[in-house]
């Protein structure tokens, strides 16, 4: 504790007797409570009353000792002391004298809902949720409140680890066989220091106000859900996997987003810097991306639906993945491979495209484009019949296809098995049987 508070030798000398008296007062305030699980209904009610009395007694001791600690500590050190120990009611099991409860053979929600106050949240920096917890970050909350079935709530835990609020179930015993029908709701106050959210199996976190911070690290998996808007943040790292879901808008300086294994991300992304986004393994992303630089990779059955707007962008679609949406990029590099497909209205100065292995790239719209370079192979297809391109440089081979419109100069190098259809007033440098005007 002394190390946590960073006390000087002089402070330690004055702090020790006060802290010793404080701990003794806590011990006197807490009364033992019988295990309500093995008792009848009346005994369970009595145990609940005793538990609440313990919480009130602990709160009173902490309140009484604020002024005593103030003789030695600053207000911030007192706050840190109570945070480090676990604030009033944070760990109900400790206040009740139940520190090592294990889940029984079968734990099934009774349907009888009860609510407990677990005390103040403090200046927490992270939230971590175990299975079945649904956490709401509320601007109107003042303390942590937990609502669950009356036969479940005594098996819930809150640990504080370096500023992290970690919600979980008590450890399973060797005889635990089934956990079912659990509904656990937690409401926590807002913390300006929040930087991380980690959501586990069938759990969720929802923020009822936009989250702000220098950097954010958010992850969810195994059907975990997060609903939150991020604004004015720095570097943001977001991972969605294993049927997890993230819903909300993101405004940040830079982003690293990953959606995989049937994960779902719904919401727009706006970056002042670089946005690195990957969607794979049948994951899906539905939302516009706006950034100075966009690096988007969609693969392995992944899906992206939304507009891309950037000064420069690199888009890659492969392995049966799909991408669709408007592309407003001054300098675009795009590759489509392995039966991937990309379709969208393009507006920009330059485009460099590579399409192969049954990939399909369709650039729609009638915007004026300065230069487009296309490399086609292995039955790849490129289609931009209405795009007003000034200069084209196309190389096509291995049964690939292209359909284009050109206004100035059209350079084509095509193998005998490739086919190119063109239109427009542009001058064609090469003419052969497989290069034809529409």
Predicted segments with their positions:
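A short amphipathic beta-strand at an alpha->beta junction
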Residues: 79, 420-421
């Amino acid at each position: 504790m002394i190390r946590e508070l960073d006390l000087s030798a002089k402070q330690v000398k004055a702090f020790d007797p006060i802290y010793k008296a404080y701990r003794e007062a806590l011990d006197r305030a807490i009364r033992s409570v019988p295990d309500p699980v093995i008792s009848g209904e009346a005994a369970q009610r009595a145990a609940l009353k005793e538990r609440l009395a313990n919480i009130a007694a602990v709160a009173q001791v902490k309140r009484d000792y604020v002024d005593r600690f103030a003789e030695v500590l600053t207000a911030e050190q007192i706050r840190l002391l109570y945070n480090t120990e676990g604030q009033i009611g944070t760990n109900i099991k400790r206040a009740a004298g139940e520190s090592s409860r294990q889940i029984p053979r079968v734990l099934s929600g009774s349907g009888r809902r009860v609510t407990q106050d677990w005390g103040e949240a403090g200046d927490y920096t992270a939230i971590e949720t175990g299975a079945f917890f649904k956490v709401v970050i509320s601007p109107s909350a003042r303390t942590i409140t937990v609502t669950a079935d009356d036969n479940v709530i005594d098996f819930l835990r809150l640990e504080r680890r370096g500023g992290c609020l970690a919600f979980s179930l008590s450890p399973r015993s060797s005889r635990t066989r089934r956990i079912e029908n659990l509904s656990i709701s937690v409401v926590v106050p807002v913390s300006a220091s929040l930087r991380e959210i980690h959501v586990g199996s069938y759990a969720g976190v929802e923020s009822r106000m936009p989250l702000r911070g220098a950097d954010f690290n958010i992850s969810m998996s195994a059907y975990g859900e997060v609903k939150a808007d991020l604004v004015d943040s720095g570097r943001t790292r977001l991972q969605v996997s294993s049927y997890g879901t993230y819903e909300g808008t993101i405004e940040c300086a830079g982003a690293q987003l990953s959606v995989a294994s049937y994960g779902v991300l719904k919401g727009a992304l706006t970056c002042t810097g670089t946005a690195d986004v990957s969607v794979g393994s049948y994951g899906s992303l539905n939302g516009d991306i706006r950034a100075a630089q966009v690096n988007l990779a969609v693969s392995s059955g992944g899906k992206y639906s939304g507009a891309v707007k950037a000064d420069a962008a690199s888009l890659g679609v492969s392995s049966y993945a799909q991408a669709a949406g408007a592309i407003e990029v001054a300098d675009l590099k795009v590759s489509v491979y392995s039966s991937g497909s990309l379709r969208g209205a393009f507006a920009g100065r330059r485009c460099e495209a590579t399409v192969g292995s049954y990939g399909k790239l369709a650039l729609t719209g009638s915007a004026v484009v300065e230069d487009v370079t296309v490399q086609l192979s292995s039955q790849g297809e490129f289609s931009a019949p209405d795009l007003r391109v000034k200069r084209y440089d196309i190389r096509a081979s291995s049964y690939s296809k292209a359909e284009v419109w050109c206004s100035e100069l059209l350079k084509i190098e095509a193998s005998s098995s490739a086919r190119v259809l063109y239109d427009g007033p542009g001058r064609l440098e090469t003419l052969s049987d497989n290069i034809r005007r529409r």
